[in-house]
Amino acid sequence: MSARMFVLCCIWFIVAFLWITITSALDKEWMIDGRGINNVCDVLMYLEEDDTRDVGVIMTLPLFFPFLWFALWRKKRGWFMYATALAIFGYWLWQFFLRYQFCL
């Protein structure tokens, strides 16, 4: 793996991390204070109509296009690129789906 590919993967990870964090935040997540609303599950329970995660999922899907382009069409495969894509995909899953699965 070249140094250029390493730097591009790091930049891609930082941009993807910030974009996923921005688009996955609930509108009223600032209300978590520990007194009345203790966690994200309480926010979802009290404010169900303000859930905008479906728009965030669609807005963040293009983050995976560079990985698909390099890995599938250009045949540039390296362990660091796979690790970066796996980390981004894991964070994407956590922010949009998994952290809400245990709210019963």
From Swiss-Prot:
Residues 27-52, 99-104 are periplasmic. It comes from Escherichia coli (strain K12). Disulfide bonds: none annotated. Signal peptide: none annotated. It is found in: Cell inner membrane. The chain crosses the membrane at residues 6-26, 53-73, 78-98. This is Inner membrane protein YjeO. It is a multi-pass membrane protein. Pfam families: DUF2645. The keyword Endoplasmic reticulum does not apply. Keywords: Cell inner membrane, Cell membrane, Membrane, Transmembrane, Transmembrane helix. Residues 1-5, 74-77 are cytoplasmic. The keyword Nucleotide-binding does not apply. InterPro entries: DUF2645 (IPR022553). GO terms for cellular component: plasma membrane. Its main location: membrane.
